[in-house]
A protein has these predicted regions:
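Short beta-strand micro-motifs within the conserved protein kinase catalytic domain, predominantly
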Residues: 124-131, 141
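Glycine-rich ATP phosphate-binding loop
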Residues: 79-96, 122
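Conserved catalytic-loop aspartate of Hanks-type protein kinases
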Residues: 244
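Regulatory alphaC helix of protein kinase catalytic domains
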Residues: 105-109
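Intrinsically disordered, low-complexity cytosolic regulatory tails
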Residues: 2-49, 293-375
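A conserved loop-to-beta-strand element in the N-lobe of protein kinase catalytic cores
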Residues: 130-138, 146-147
Length: 375
């Protein structure tokens, strides 16, 4: 049986990107979905999302007749849209005759319409006019994390920036699992779906495969991106919160190594698990472009956490809330160290100033001593 596993072809120009999907035969769930969302029922469901509806002509004008292309994905092309009021958005258009795209379009409208978090890419509207299926998102001006890790002509991310991105993504997924009601499992966490805004804050994107966690929700065939998919999910076809945790663990190793999960990342990580002295040699797999500018204690903490996340058995993986808390503690320790360094610098400065004051005082005393008349 052919599994609809997404491949992670990196689109260096993507700002909002799906990646290529290999389609197997339609599943029972797909048929149920298609039959349920029809005609007036579909329009009713979309209207209940509460999202603004954009007229097709307005989007056509804002994208210069859909010529300002940013990238291409399984869903269809993505365009940059500049609205008359000055706002800039990313517009994702459903490719014609795309059954998978129709499903993902409805899924994103229904799921993202009720989700709001600073570490998610917000859906700001849609168009479902005369057969057109278009999603309108916030524009992420710095593109995807994958572009920074693998794209040409990009400055390598600093270690501090990589830790911050890990913290941002963890907060976004934690919100999906524990803050949303009902909870949401993303099911396609990967570097191409982590977008960076103008301040380089990371946001989780692409909810076309995501699902709300409900007891009556049917299971589906395995979907996701090769290299990121939970092996337990592949064997059971049952997705859980821990499937997202596994994918996030792969993402952490990506941030550390800048190695593609589809090109031997985990084999490379395996070489570092035991070095000649019988200790974990995480320093050996760090991205060479960092030139050793890495906080070693943070590296070890990050790699150890990633290793727990990618445990083959889901019961041995931490929940996303625990993962997020551990990553936030790294930031607290870093800030504490920075404050301590600043305090020591201030103390050293004060001591230097105090010594200077003493010397000034001694000079003043000497200057105040009257000269003795010559005999």
């Amino acid at each position: 049986m052919q599994l609809p596993i997404r491949t992670n072809g990196i689109d260096a120009s993507s700002v909002l990107s799906d990646t290529t999907t290999e389609h197997g035969s339609p599943t029972k769930e797909n048929k149920q979905f298609s039959s349920w969302f029809r005609g007036s029922e579909k329009r009713s469901v979309l209207s209940h999302s509460g999202l603004p509806v954009y007229p097709y002509k307005d989007l056509q004008k804002a994208t210069s007749n859909f010529t300002n292309k940013l990238g291409e994905g399984a869903f269809g092309p993505v365009f940059k849209a500049i609205m008359p009021h000055g706002g800039t958005f990313a517009v994702k258009m459903l490719a014609s005759r795309s059954r998978q795209g129709e499903k993902e379009f409805l899924n994103e409208v229904l799921v993202l319409g009720r989700l709001h978090h600073r570490n998610l890419v917000n859906l700001v509207g849609y168009c479902a006019e005369k057969g057109h299926r278009i999603l309108v998102y916030e524009y992420m001006s710095n593109g995807s994390l994958a572009e920074f890790l693998y794209g040409e002509g990009r400055e390598p991310l600093s270690w501090d920036r990589r830790v911050q991105i890990a913290q941002d993504v963890a907060r976004g997924i934690e919100y999906l699992h524990d803050g949303a009601s009902p909870p949401v499992i993303h099911r396609d966490i990967k570097s191409a779906n982590i977008l960076l805004d103008g301040s380089m804050k990371a946001r989780v994107a692409d909810f076309g495969l995501s699902k709300e966690v409900r007891s009556d929700y049917p299971s589906s065939g395995v979907q996701g991106t090769y290299g990121y998919v939970d092996p337990e999910y592949i064997s059971t076809a049952q997705f859980t919160h821990k499937s997202d945790v596994y994918s996030f663990g792969i993402l952490l190793f990506e941030l550390i190594t800048a190695r593609n999960p589809q090109k031997g990342l985990m084999d490379y990580v395996g070489l570092a698990l035991l070095n000649a002295e019988g200790e974990e040699g995480w320093e050996e797999i760090v991205d060479d472009r960092l030139n050793g500018n890495v906080n070693l204690s943070e590296l070890r903490a990050l790699a150890s956490l990633a290793r727990r996340c990618v445990s083959p058995t889901s019961n041995n993986r931490p929940r996303m809330r625990e993962v997020s808390q551990q990553l936030q503690r790294l930031g607290i320790r870093r800030n504490s160290s920075r404050i301590e360094r600043n305090r020591m610098t201030v103390n050293d400065t004060l001591q230097t100033m105090s010594m200077a004051d003493v010397l000034k005082g001694d000079l003043k005393i000497l200057n105040d001593i009257p000269e003795q008349p010559e005999v």
